[in-house]
Amino acid sequence: MKNEMLALILAGGQGTRLGKLTQSIAKPAVQFGGRYRIIDFALSNCANSGIHNVGVVTQYQPLALNNHIGNGSSWGLDGINSGVSILQPYSASEGNRWFEGTSHAIYQNIDYIDSVNPEYVLILSGDHIYKMDYDDMLQSHKDNNASLTVAVLDVPLKEASRFGIMNTDANNRIVEFEEKPAQPKSTKASMGIYIFDWQRLRNMLVAAEKSKVGMSDFGKNVIPNYLESGESVYAYEFSGYWKDVGTIESLWEANMEYISPENALDSRNRQWKIYSRNLISPPNFLGANAHVEDSLVVDGCFVDGTVKHSILSTGAQVREGAEVLDSVIMSGAIIGQGAKIKRAIIGEGAIISDGVEIDGTDEVQVVGYNEVVGVATDED
């Protein structure tokens, strides 16, 4: 049976710009917003868009990510005719199959894709925060009779040189692609979201592999190849909230935007929920000295200090006399008595000992997973 569209989430990047936060886990597994991991947004978008088959392409430090996704039940992707498949590099008779780039990762999983037998493939990045109806993008792809549709976001001209820029005609057909141009001709930035006709993409990838032509990356190789070949390539304009959280600063900003009164992500929209694998935790406990304002405090937290404009993830502790301001405290982290945290991201299971001060006024500070800052006490 032919499935209409298969989603493939690229989740194998190392995420070196997130520093300590990705030393032991893949970037899409990094926590966000108190109860989510970054990949939850792509998975939830798939579920809400009616996509029933999803492949997650992993490579770097996949254990936490694999455990989080499980069988896909948290996103309703564990039915008879639906499912999530974890796609990791493996050795084959022809040798090593380590992924060399985004499109190469797709080529290496041709057998899996063929087994699903889709008419279209949706390529997604696993490290962006946004809500999108992929079905609407697919309809645009069909209406344009396109071979490839690229989701684009209008960005300020001064920021356009940071992105792959799509130059289009009056009908939104892409006529030129520029990778991080010094002097951009337009402000339509690629979001790294693509819909391909599968057979056309498959034929191109197989031919490139046979001829040993480098075709490892969608932005650098595949899109230019499609344009040079005269394929019909169109832009799909997206106007909602979208954030690339590939740096410490952008991850911190996205978390702060998430708890802002405006909340452009519209996290409380019951018509488009963000799902996650949530463990059962006890209720929060607020001690006699607790003072919490303008903050998001998730299940299982213990607070006996001051928390302002911050996020406390599942099971975090802020002990007596501690102060947390403009910060993200990830699951299980402990902020000791009298400690002061400002503009920081504290990783899962980290311990900030009594009296320690972390000040990110000039630059957002990061404490890694299970890292101990200061001298931990027996209580920790």
UniProtKB/Swiss-Prot annotation:
Span of the signal peptide: none
An example Gene Ontology biological process: glycogen biosynthetic process
Family according to the record: Belongs to the bacterial/plant glucose-1-phosphate adenylyltransferase family.
Keywords: ATP-binding, Carbohydrate metabolism, Glycogen biosynthesis, Glycogen metabolism, Nucleotide-binding, Nucleotidyltransferase, Transferase
CDD domains named in the record: ADP_Glucose_PP, LbH_G1P_AT_C
Catalysis: reaction(s): alpha-D-glucose 1-phosphate + ATP + H(+) = ADP-alpha-D-glucose + diphosphate
Pathway: Glycan biosynthesis; glycogen biosynthesis
Assembly and oligomerization: Homotetramer.
Entries under Pfam families matching the protein: Hexapep_GlmU, NTP_transferase
Annotated protein name in UniProt: Glucose-1-phosphate adenylyltransferase
PANTHER family in the cross-refs: GLUCOSE-1-PHOSPHATE ADENYLYLTRANSFERASE, GLUCOSE-1-PHOSPHATE ADENYLYLTRANSFERASE-RELATED
Any GO MF annotation of the entry: ATP binding
Protein residues bound to alpha-D-glucose 1-phosphate: 164, 179-180, 190
HAMAP family given in the database record: GlgC
Function field: Involved in the biosynthesis of ADP-glucose, a building block required for the elongation reactions to produce glycogen. Catalyzes the reaction between ATP and alpha-D-glucose 1-phosphate (G1P) to produce pyrophosphate and ADP-Glc.
Origin superkingdom: Bacteria
Record carries keyword Repeat: no
Record-listed E.C. numbers: 2.7.7.27
